[in-house]
Amino acid sequence: MASRIGLGLAALGRPVYIDVGRDRDLGSERTRAAMEARCREVLDAAYAAGIRYVDVARSYGDAEAFLGAWLDAGDGSEVVVGSKWGYTYLGGWRLDADVQEVKDLSVAAFRRQIAESRRLLGDHLSLYQIHSATIESGVFDDRELLDELRSVRESGLVLGFSTSGPQQAEAIVRGLRERVDGEPLFSTVQSTWNVLEPSAGPALAEAHADGRGVLIKEAMANGRLGATDGPLGGVAGRLGTTPDRVALAAVHAQPWADVVLSGAATVEQVRSNASAVDVMLPDDALAAMNELAQPPARYWADRAALPWR
């Protein structure tokens, strides 16, 4: 992959997101112009820190437009871009919108959204992923959609899928089975893995062993692992570092993890996140963090209860 730390723009392409500490990070100035300026600043800082993979999605508000404009200005010549389809942003740039996004994994939605992504990102788009592929969505059983994906793959675009929810492992294993003429349909998988929710680990190890690229999202559990008085504060203090670095370093300690995504909303955060590649966690710290794991159903219920802010 392009770099061991990537940058996801979920927090920067729209005015609200599910993230603890967002009010502190962004304040009240969240106009489109303000968010685009912030996004450019963070992209500049990420690139300067060595980050070469950027991850967006159709549902991340104007993230694709912000990123496309930044790239067209020549500011990230070595950046590899991945985007996702399957959710549509409905927030209308309102902080109080009742519905921020809606999921639709139909073939019609794919055709519409890949055209939109290509219009905004052009030739910069290298990887296109199903957004939150789950067993219950039926996406892996939709033969018309899979045939459409195959034709897109044959045109040269790399395909992947992301997962969410307590049954991530089952979705990963199911997605790995899809093949075209004996070759994998999906070259990458992007999943949630963190010290609170490590249940997808064995399936991700299987994906890595099979030659797929493994990208990790939500390594900081939507900000829950970033506080000095949070679950990783003690470990970070003993190691003389910060909780965000510990959270990301815990992912890098997994031999199957290729890229861990930073969800930074500020320049300071992305610089700190990028430096996590230099943090080596001792065995006793890793063992202590293993004790933090929650039952997947509890973790995802807690996540679902987080407010958009």
In which residue ranges do the predicted regions lie?
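Feature marks short, surface-exposed loop/turn motifs that line or immediately flank catalytic pockets
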Residues: 11-13, 60, 87-91, 134-136, ...
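Active-site mouth loops of central-metabolism enzymes
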Residues: 15-37, 95-111, 136-137, 235-238
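Short, well-ordered coil/turn segments that N-cap beta-strands
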Residues: 2-5, 50-53, 75-79, 122-126, ...
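Active-site groove signature of glycoside hydrolases
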Residues: 116-139
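Structural motif corresponding to the early beta-alpha repeats
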Residues: 78-104
